[in-house]
Amino acid sequence: LIFNELNKELYKKFFLTVEEIQAIREGYIYIHDMSARRDTMNCCLFDVKNVLSGGFEMGNLWYNEPKTLDTAFDVIGDIVLSAASQQYGGFTVPSVDEILEPYAEKSHKKLIEKYRGLGLDEETVQKVAWADLEKEMEQGFQGWEYKFNSVSSSRGDYPFITVTAGTRTSIYGKLATIKMLEVRKNGQGKDGHKKPVLFPKIVFLYDENLHGPGKPLEDVFEAGIECSRKTMYPDWLSLTGDGYVPVSYTHLT
């Protein structure tokens, strides 16, 4: 508390004008997170996809790019917690379905090769390989929920982590979004007492041209509706129309 109050006073002294300070006192303006503005940035849209590509260095240790889906989940979790603990405010990982696509495909190919090597017929190979991939995706999101809701930052709080998803049309992108929603819907905790967790906050990117009736992602939309019905998650952003969000999203992508 003392540290926060000191930072607020230092910020007022060195970064605000007399007029701005007076406006704060009179309630005309409010500066969010004033106690942390001198030390670090506030809120971040983090490009995890680019960080993973080709490998990266973190904490004086080189991380190779993941070769399987379960490793990708572990590494992304490490990245998010490390980066989020070095800033204040929200930390968003956009389009996790797109990020996980290539690693899901790599795992799927490895699983197919594994079961073919056992001499199984092709139909069985495809069936059990896909079932294993579904389980791997489910366990990955369960791991995120445990990690992001139990590992606190050096400030003593839990990073406000948000992920977005919902626009990928490949089988792997769709699987990622659907499994993420199913994990959130099922909740965590003891049997008979499960409840949805807080983090990561899920934002569903809705596009009428992708999620409308008869469109390629209608089943993903239905999974989102079912999750909302039971948990009040995810939040929804519409990418359709001429509003601020669709225009901004189109510009960024």
Residue ranges and their predicted role:
Residues D39-G119:
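Function-dense linear segments that define catalytic or interfacial modules
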